[in-house]
Curated annotation (Swiss-Prot):
Induction data: Up-regulated by osteopontin.
Identification of the protein by name: Tumor necrosis factor receptor superfamily member 11B
Provenance organism: Rattus norvegicus (Rat)
Keyword Signal: yes
Cystine crosslinks: 41-54, 44-62, 65-80, 83-97, 87-105, 107-118, 124-142, 145-160, 166-185
Subunit comment: Homodimer. Interacts with TNFSF10 and TNFSF11.
Location relative to the cell: Secreted
The organism's place on the tree of life at top rank: Eukaryota
One Pfam family it belongs to: TNFR_c6
Length: 401
């Protein structure tokens, strides 16, 4: 009898468990002292707690959890659970406490949780690249660079990069790369020295300075007639007028005039006079030896069309470290229809805060922008512009960037 009784009890419990699991809302058994019966009551939903059990006349009474407490599942508890206190050191809030969820903390950017501590992500040394980037839950996974790939930096984010294909760049391979160094290519020394920058930051600032605060009628024609050397033809002027706004036309005209008159003594003299500005820009940002990853982040932060990883890699191979950033900014300006580079940089600086970008670099970029907007440079631009056009356009009020 005892054996049959045990089997019957097990079957009964299985039925009760199946019933409470399959029905919705989930149920629980409650003994009702008023009737002496076992009742199937509704459980309380997440975000609430049990106030009163059900009876034969009414359903279970559940009420919302008070502030700073929660329940995250269907339950029969008569109280809510208090939320965890504030996050620990080096942690940030991933999800705030609410009635259905506890406060969730995670390690801040660049760290992962190991036991109870937020440790820095592993940095892969030269010769090893990142196979799996670190997350708030796990450390960085490094892997040795295979044949044909390299990593020349210590980084917690940079993967192994493919060796440069010198022939695709029109260059010769003079030293084969390995796991820690890229292929070394040979090329045109003069092209490498000036890095193919069509308009430098200082020249761009100077050309944009020449835009009057109020465009006078036929301003572009007056400027064309006033510029020395080979004149920009009427067809080119009309094309500039069709494609660009009135504020952008002066910059486009001066850029074309410089290209057509690069061998003119006047242009050479202006470029020499701008050397003071260029030296200062190099002093501010020329020392910023940015990694490929940092250049990628900076280019991603600029508005508009983006510079591709291949273009960044090609620039790193064909430009000196001190000119790489300037070359990429020049490429960005061209790709975005000659957008104002300084305005693009100011936009990027607002967004770099989220990337923990080196403060020394952002500080240098801000100093460069302030320098190119300074009164000293305003006076230099004014002097150069008057030298360039002589005294033929005296009525034009010139504005600094």
């Amino acid at each position: 009898m005892n054996k049959w009784l045990c089997c019957a009890l097990l079957v009964f419990l299985d039925i009760i468990e199946w019933t409470t699991q399959e029905t919705f809302p989930p149920k629980y058994l409650h003994y009702d002292p008023e009737t002496g019966r076992q009742l199937l009551c509704d459980k309380c939903a997440p975000g609430t707690y049990l106030k009163q059990h059900c009876t034969v006349r009414r359903k279970t009474l559940c009420v919302p959890c008070p502030d700073y407490s929660y329940t995250d599942s269907w339950h029969t508890s008569d109280e809510c659970v208090y939320c965890s206190p504030v996050c620990k050191e080096l942690q940030t809030v991933k999800q705030e406490c609410n009635r259905t969820h506890n406060r969730v903390c995670e390690c801040e950017e660049g760290r992962y949780l190991e036991l109870e501590f937020c440790l820095k992500h592993r940095s892969c040394p030269p010769g090893l690249g990142v196979l799996q980037a670190g997350t708030p839950e796990r450390n960085t996974v490094c892997k040795r660079c295979p044949d044909g790939f390299f990593s020349g930096e210590t980084s917690s984010k940079a993967p192994c990069r493919k060796h440069t294909n010198c022939s695709s760049l029109g260059l010769l391979l003079i030293q084969k790369g390995n796991a820690t160094h890229d292929n070394v290519c040979s090329g045109n020394r003069e092209a490498t020295q000036n890095c193919g920058i069509d308009v430098t930051l200082c020249e761009e600032a100077f050309f944009r300075f020449a835009v009057p605060t109020k465009i006078i009628p036929n301003w572009l024609s007056v400027l064309v007639d006033s510029l020395p050397g080979t004149k920009v033809n009427a067809e080119s002027v009309e094309r500039i007028k069709r494609r660009h706004s009135s504020q952008e036309q002066t910059f486009q005209l001066l850029k074309l005039w410089k290209h057509q008159n690069r061998d003119q003594e006047m242009v050479k003299k202006i470029i020499q006079d701008i050397d003071l500005c260029e030296s200062s820009v190099q002093r501010h940002i020329g020392h910023a030896n940015l990694t490929t990853e940092q250049l990628r982040i900076l280019m991603e932060s600029l508005p508009g069309k983006k510079i591709s990883p291949d273009e960044i890699e090609r620039t790193r191979k064909t430009c000196k470290p001190s000119e790489q950033l300037l070359k990429l900014l020049s490429l960005w300006r061209i790709k975005n229809g000659d957008q104002d580079t300084l305005k693009g940089l100011m936009y990027a600086l607002k967004h770099l805060k989220a990337y923990h970008f080196p403060k020394t670099v952002t500080h240098s970029l801000r100093k460069t922008i302030r320098f190119l907007h300074s009164f000293t440079m305003y006076r230099l631009y004014q002097k150069l512009f008057l030298e360039m056009i002589g005294n033929q356009v005296q009525s034009v009020k010139i504005s600094c960037l």
